[in-house]
From Swiss-Prot:
Transmembrane segments: none annotated. InterPro entries: Uncharacterised_CoxE, Uncharacterised_ViaA, VWF_A, vWFA_dom_sf. One of its GO terms (cellular component) is cytosol. Keywords: Chaperone, Cytoplasm. It comes from Escherichia coli O9:H4 (strain HS). HAMAP family: ViaA (MF_01626). This is Regulatory protein ViaA. It is found in: Cytoplasm. The keyword Iron-sulfur does not apply. Component of the RavA-ViaA chaperone complex, which may act on the membrane to optimize the function of some of the respiratory chains. ViaA stimulates the ATPase activity of RavA. CDD domains: VWA_YIEM_type. Belongs to the ViaA family.
Amino acid sequence: MLTLDTLNVMLAVSEEGLIEEMIIALLASPQLAVFFEKFPRLKAAITDDVPRWREALRSRLKDARVPPELTEEVMCYQQSQLLSTPQFIVQLPQILDLLHRLNSPWAEQARQLVDANSAITSALHTLFLQRWRLSLIVQATTLNQQLLEEEREQLLSEVQERMTLSGQLEPILADNNTAAGRLWDMSAGQLKRGDYQLIVKYGEFLNEQPELKRLAEQLGRSREAKSIPRNDAQMETFRTMVREPATVPEQVDGLQQSDDILRLLPPELATLGITELEYEFYRRLVEKQLLTYRLHGESWREKVIERPVVHKDYDEQPRGPFIVCVDTSGSMGGFNEQCAKAFCLALMRIALAENRRCYIMLFSTEIVRYELSGPQGIEQAIRFLSQQFRGGTDLASCFRAIMERLQSREWFDADAVVISDFIAQRLPDDVTSKVKELQRVHQHRFHAVAMSAHGKPGIMRIFDHIWRFDTGMRSRLLRRWRR
């Protein structure tokens, strides 16, 4: 069967002009004009999509099939062009019957033209074919316009859906034109309104926690210099006090007086429930005289190392991708979970604005991965925000997954971020030594976002930077009062 592209070539119909007219009409539609005025940053992103629209329309016209009736009429026209005038006179009755049978727009005019002339001359033969060709061009142009109109309606519907999605998420995720462009690209997925409302919800929560948002921005902007030791540098002795585990970490070896609520003896806690002794409990708490378990597990010793006296130069580290590990244990539920998800959303915003990648790993008993900056970033973000934190804590697996990711070339300059309350078992020695090697040799940076004031110091010492956001009730009330 004849294709529309072939018909356009045969009749010299300019499809490019029709496509350009359709795109201009689409961009000038009232819906897009209002949207561009409201979200000017997304205008450039949508305009960048025009070449893709143009190519899709060309492909649609190229693959479209011509109706059988029009195909048969075109074939008859081509055969008629090869006839001499005497042959044309002989074939004319069959041609007129064919045009009538096919309900051709040219059929009635053709019969009137023949009836108006008593003799078929060479000039009439040429005029007949010229007018027939014009009729075919009109039919081909109409067919092109019908197909383009169908595509325009479909394209306008798609653009309106993406505009609705992008317009909702632009205040949350788009910080500049780069972010707006990437957000528009990610809006091409099949998403429903109820899906992306989850991102809007956490975006509103993030706006209610300006300290958390500011913390994410500080982490995103943090940049250190790489110091490169000289090969011939003189060495000097450097002494420092280090804390290290002694015997069994956190082993109970007696009782002591302190204000450590987490290690409180049950009899002391019982006095809190007695009205007459409640003030006495608070007095002893303030004076650190409550009976608590004494733990044995850490000691200090002097460590002597040698290091170069001078350094050759400093290379500023580029801002690489984010590898974010989120603790999904039960202790991270509730408000901690909301803060962790909102913090990741803030990092996603930074990654989109600075053309970086943002890779999320959820760790508990197993590791689940999401890439929030890829083509399916919005869908991945929705799946991540839909997760519930009810697992256990396996920090060792988290660090092993990070180190495995850092070995690949595309993630070599990534920043590793661990979001947790850091109430967990101590890390194995092999994991600790590997992390220190990455920090020392490859200058990788490990960030900790601590959601609790009770995180274990033995775990947190491994990080280059510790960003604290205490989610305890007292800290939350203080932050609200300061606002």
